Amino acid sequence: MEIHGKNFLETLKELEKHVDSAHYVSIDCEFSGLLRDFNLNNKNTLQDRYELLRKSSIRYTILQIGITFIYLQNNGKSSCIPVNINVSPLVKDELHLKRDFCSEASSIKFLIQQGFDFNKQLTEGVPYLSRIEERNLIDKVNERSTDDLTSSILDACDEEILVDARNQIKNWLSSELSHSTSKYLNITTSNRFIRKAIQSLVKIEFPTLKSYPKRTFLQVRKAIENSTTQCSATSKSELKEDIASDQLILNNLNLIKQNVGLRHLWDYILKKKKSVVCHNGMADLVYLFSLFEGKVPETILEFSELCLSSFKSIYDTKLLYLKSDDLQHVSDGIPTDLLSLVSKISLPPVPSNSSSQRSNVSLNSLIECPYKSMMSRKRPHEAGKDSYDTALLFVYYVMRTKHSDIQRWQNVLPIHGSFLDLNKYCS
């Protein structure tokens, strides 16, 4: 299933239903770049290895996300529903949001060689706002609707204008006490910002007075003497301004909500605390938190705690095929990259009288998927395809081996030649 900017909202409910009902969710990402340190060795700590990934996720971003929903069925088969999502870094001009987009030349070259369509990713991808970006935008809108904004206008206003307004009000009050002047004071103003500034001055320094904005001036009256008749026109004018202001605020908040975009799906996965499957997925997880949360924990301990609190469990198929005794007949003598492992388990079944350790059940017989034929023709390094292949590896493990050590390798992730056991690290 291909998800893009135009069909994301209409397919979101369907995706959420899959999140609800799937037993596992496999995830894969394509990055705009990845920092590497070829000097990493056994002397480097897990924190050193994590710090490299953290810096990488801050500098670079995710171009594409693949998600496959895995259903385990009672008939010994499974259903895998793959989704491919291009992620657009572009934001609407109305949001006034500055966002950097960095890429690594070698990563871009590699993806082009694999047939990656960058024009499609940028123009048709699903937009998003990180949690921090959304919060900052909402705060800006709220600031405009509070007295804090008026205070900032007051501070920025020409001091002489405020001094003159203050003196006019004081003189009027003195004259009004001797009953020798009008029951109201009109203060001429050149624009609405100055009117707001003087309104704030009246509210702060003269609490017994009320001010009413007119087109070219501000009218000041005693609050206790403002009858309904006297102020009806002014009240209507104020009401219209308030309604217009509230509508503007509401429109801005709605605009922000609409542009949360792809993070709605991420939030739903976190809400349901799903079991996640990945392949060499430490980088995927770090980048996902960076993209959607807007920040990544500084320490590997904090990151481990974040993962355990966000997901029910995490399984890494690279680690499983490296370490599980139940899978050594697959991984023995071949690389543990995704393509090599999937090619191995996709081999035709051996005869039942053969001495080979390879399973005598074909991989195809394990999978029921309307996209199976299409996925078999796709090129690797499309995120949707890679998440689907990751799902195949996991399905093979749980349905065609004893998977006796599944608890042992739960929440353990490979990281730059080492392993991070989230359970032990947080204990």
Curated annotation (Swiss-Prot):
* Sample GO molecular function, one term: 3'-5'-RNA exonuclease activity
Record's Gene Ontology CC terms? condensed chromosome, centromeric region; nucleus
One short Pfam name that applies is CAF1
Q: Which GO terms describe its biological process?
A: priRNA 3'-end processing; regulatory ncRNA-mediated heterochromatin formation; siRNA 3'-end processing
* Annotated InterPro entries: CAF1_poly(A)_ribonucleases, RNase_CAF1, RNaseH-like_sf, RNaseH_sf
What protein family does this chain belong to? Belongs to the CAF1 family.
Q: What is the protein named?
A: Uncharacterized protein C29A10.09c
Origin species: Schizosaccharomyces pombe (strain 972 / ATCC 24843)
